[in-house]
Amino acid sequence: MRLLITGGAGFIGSAYTKKLIAQGDEVIVYDALTYAGNLDNLKEVEENHSYKFIHGNVCDLKKLDETIDGCDGVVHFAAESHVDRSIADPSPFIETNCTGTANLCELVLKNKIEKYVHISTDEVYGSIGNKIGEGSFTEEDPLRPSSPYSATKAAADLIALSYHHTHGLPVSIIRPSNNYGPNQFPEKIIPLFITNLLEGKPVPLYGDGLNIRDWCNVEDTCEAIDTVLKKGEKGCVYNAGAGNEKTNLELAEKLIELCDADKSLIQKTTDRAGHDRRYSINSNLIHQLGWHPECDFEKGLEKTVEWYKQNRQWWEPLRDSSQ
């Protein structure tokens, strides 16, 4: 299968690209290489004859059209994805996440692409409950995004679904929970905490630290995406969570333990504006396709910490350039 992977130099996109190539698929990565896109994530496949990289933006309709020609399928990762950055300046989120998605929908139709998997997020549902176990969103629940980031992702979902209902766009949408693993840009909470702790720096904890997230290992998420690509119904949405709900405080304390650091490094900070209390999704629909998360959270976290310990040359330049 010849697949176009937009945003394939990012965290999840690069992991999925490597999975596809290992499976024998032909992959074209199309990435704008903004601050979170990094070709070092793809070094192990850059000489593979089944891999090709195109430097381009999903808002560049002409270049995207030239790139998509001849592909069998598209997996659309390309997005601006950091909540705090969206609060500071929503403009690039609107452009990339909304206009970029509309461009891709047009070109999938024009080029008669067989399958289009759109990568969304559990954040489009908004917050649910205040404690672990207090309900979960299903795919039928209304979208109530809270941040400019999640609002643009919800808009992108609706754009893609509107193209399905109006034009028969062969799209399936997957809404994963929070991801973690190697090669994640160090502004995100887990790599931010790990890299700070490895350097003896404080870990900034918003508010009371009791906001809850469900954590899924990136390898499990890649398997979920592949399941939707191969088995997902057109016009359907699939939640993909792992059931590893943790408060941010619990997460910080576990990472302090794994990094052999001191709890005094936890530094409470002013809460994020509009901070969602808890995300939780019901993943029964994708379970019916045969996907179930396999990675134990604590073991996955240990492996992730070890990766950042062994790969300072990867994250130190990224962290320094983003400060």
Where are each of the predicted segments found?
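C-terminal substrate-binding subdomain of Rossmann-fold SDR/epimerase-dehydratase oxidoreductases
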Residues: 3, 103, 197-323
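The catalytic Tyr-centered alpha-helix of NAD(P)H-dependent dehydrogenases
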Residues: 145-152, 176, 182, 186, ...
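Residues that form or flank phosphate/diphosphate-binding pockets in enzymes
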Residues: 12, 37, 62, 184, ...
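A short, amphipathic alpha-helix embedded in the catalytic core of nucleotide-handling enzymes
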Residues: 20, 163, 192-196, 224-228
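Residue-level recognition of oxygen-bearing side chains
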Residues: 63, 73, 92, 99, ...
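Short beta-loop-alpha junction of Rossmann-like oxidoreductase domains
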Residues: 127-129, 182-184, 188, 285
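A conserved short alpha-helical segment within the catalytic HATPase_c
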Residues: 160, 190, 194, 252-256
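N-terminal Rossmann-like NAD(P)+-binding domain of SDR-like oxidoreductases, especially those catalyzing
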Residues: 1-179, 310-323
